[in-house]
Amino acid sequence: RVLLAEYTKIKYWKQLAALFGSLEDNKRELLALDLTYQQNGLDKEKQFVALAYQFMAIDVPYRAAAILERAMKEGQVEKTEKNLEILGSAYQRAQEFKKASPVLEQAAKLASHGNAWSRLAGVYLNLNENEKALVAAINALSKGGLKREDLTWMNRGSAEASLHCYDAAVKSFSKAAKFDRVKKNAVNWKKYVSAEGERRNKLIANGANLAQCKKV
């Protein structure tokens, strides 16, 4: 702190950030890193990514996204699958779904696993793009290696229900119900879509002109 009062060189902010990091003082490390960033003092990809992670950790995802996007545009952060997924995740958490979708689409095409596709399914559901959500969920499950397979099945079931594919949705929610983390919610959704499917089938049988399953 004495150094900072006497000197304004960027290297001192960097050193202070490293010191706070070694002491696991995350708040002060973030402050020092951010001040370094504002003075254009970050010059390594890992520094930009670390700063973005820190803003996400304190629930300021839009700031994290802005830092990463600018760094990518300026060539300071490579557009790898991992970095794109971090950027897309930041926009998703900031509820900037229209900005999240094209980024996650890029990440999904580069990834060997299905995690970006899984995130993309959730983003598409929030944009009410149910056909795309279903395709993304199917792709995620097909690629595998998922951190949250339970949520992927939930998103798939939600997309299928929105497309009036109730039998398929029942199967997806049954799959989701095998995971303790979402079991209660999945069982409730399974009951709802099963009942809704039966209700609509009866109405259609009696001559009602209702939308039917829209397969993708």
Predicted regions and their residues:
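Alpha-solenoid helical repeat scaffolds
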Residues: R1-L163, A168-K171, K175-R200, N206-V216
